[in-house]
Amino acid sequence: FRALATLAAADQPAIGPAAMAVAERHRQHIEQWFYACPPSLHRGLGELYVQDERFAANIDRYHPGLSAYAREAWQANARRAAGDD
């Protein structure tokens, strides 16, 4: 989440190309090393990162509000993958 935190700290939009690129790298990392992670599932992980206080606390330690920023980037990336951007 460090790359995403850098973007958030620089006020780069979560729906911008740089944040979506980080989101896609994260999704591909999960898919390569853990389990199939289509964009729709990755979008759900973004929701989990915000809704579960344990995830949010862990992610937000990199930058305040980063869990919500990640959720927005993951959602934007999923929309792009579906052609809904």
Question: Where are these predicted regions, by residue range?
Answer:
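Amphipathic alpha-helical "stalk" segments
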Residues: 1-85
